[in-house]
């Protein structure tokens, strides 16, 4: 494809602008949680895959953790099975866990791997069961009624991350592969657990001490009380916004995941609008970004 002079100049300007960021992030690990509209829109799927391949090509080390809740819902519906939720968490009995594992570890994971490979990458798919990549335990939840009585909630095979075998991921990175991880964990007895993909991505980033954690979502970012996107937050400011109710509802678990990662040693975490084409590249290689960045050193992270 040939470019006219104006197009060539524009391309050169883009590359020149990106150069300092490419140099800054060279050889750094970037953990990306892939989900939401970016997984269901064919154009956004291809855009994401190309972004990941480009990151690897210019010297970064992307690690992808994906969701797939809607795909699980679709298969359960086709099978005529009901799947209840409590506080947004899927109640997962043994038969439902089999479906979750089949969808996330099978069709969804391999679809992402194939798409990245189609665009020139060397992706390899994993679940937390492979080489005990994600050690998990049963997630314990409780609820308090109007009388102040607390009772346990049994979500079945829903888990939380105990540890991540980072050696497996580092071995793959060292061999020039792009790890693509399904959010399924395993306990010491060999039981499989369905784990929230945001939480898995956060823990993977923490155990790898990644440079950046990116959570692709269906929202523009964290909003202030006026409805404007907040581009940068410190952990202290996040705590204040949760306390005063600015951050509430379904945003709290996602922001808490990002916050925990930053407090665990990840340089920065960002909630990204995954509906924007090339959102991953825009967030890393430009000043503007397309979401809300959280960092202990906000000035350095935004520079």
From Swiss-Prot:
Biological-process GO terms, alphabetical: arginine biosynthetic process via ornithine; L-arginine biosynthetic process
Keyword Transferase in annotation: yes
GO cellular component assignments: cytoplasm
First-tier enzyme category under EC: transferase
UniProt keyword list: Amino-acid biosynthesis, Arginine biosynthesis, ATP-binding, Cytoplasm, Kinase, Nucleotide-binding, Transferase
Tree of life domain: Bacteria
Record family assignment: Belongs to the acetylglutamate kinase family. ArgB subfamily.
Protein task: Catalyzes the ATP-dependent phosphorylation of N-acetyl-L-glutamate.
Name of the protein: Acetylglutamate kinase
Natural source organism: Psychrobacter sp. (strain PRwf-1)
Gene name of this polypeptide: argB
């Amino acid at each position: 494809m040939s470019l006219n002079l104006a197009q060539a100049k524009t391309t050169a300007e883009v590359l020149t602008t990106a150069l300092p960021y490419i140099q800054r992030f060279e050889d750094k690990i970037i953990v990306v949680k892939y989900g939401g509209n970016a997984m269901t829109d064919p154009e956004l799927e291809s855009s994401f895959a190309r972004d990941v391949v480009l990151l690897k090509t210019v010297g970064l080390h992307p690690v992808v953790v994906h969701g797939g809740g809607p795909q699980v819902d679709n298969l359960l519906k086709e099978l005529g099975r009901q799947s209840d939720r409590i506080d947004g968490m899927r109640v997962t009995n043994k038969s439902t866990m089999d479906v979750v594992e089949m969808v996330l570890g099978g069709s969804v994971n391999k679809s992402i791997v194939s798409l990245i490979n189609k665009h020139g990458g060397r992706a390899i798919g994993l679940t937390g069961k492979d080489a005990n990549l994600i050690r998990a335990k049963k997630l314990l939840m409780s609820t308090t009624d109007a009388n102040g009585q607390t009772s346990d909630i049994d979500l079945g095979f829903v888990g939380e991350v105990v540890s991540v075998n980072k050696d497996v991921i580092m071995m793959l990175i060292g061999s020039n592969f792009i790890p693509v991880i399904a959010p399924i964990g395993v306990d010491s007895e060999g039981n499989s657990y369905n784990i929230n993909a945001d939480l898995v991505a956060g823990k993977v980033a923490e155990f790898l001490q990644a440079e950046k954690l990116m959570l692709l979502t269906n929202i523009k970012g964290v909003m202030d009380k006026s409805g404007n996107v907040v581009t940068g937050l410190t952990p202290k400011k996040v705590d204040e916004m949760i306390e005063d109710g600015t951050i509430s509802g379904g945003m709290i678990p996602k922001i808490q995941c990002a916050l925990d990662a930053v407090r665990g040693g990840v340089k920065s975490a960002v909630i990204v609008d995954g509906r924007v084409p090339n959102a991953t590249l825009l967030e890393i290689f430009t000043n503007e970004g397309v979401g809300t960045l959280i960092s202990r050193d906000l000035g350095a992270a935004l520079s």
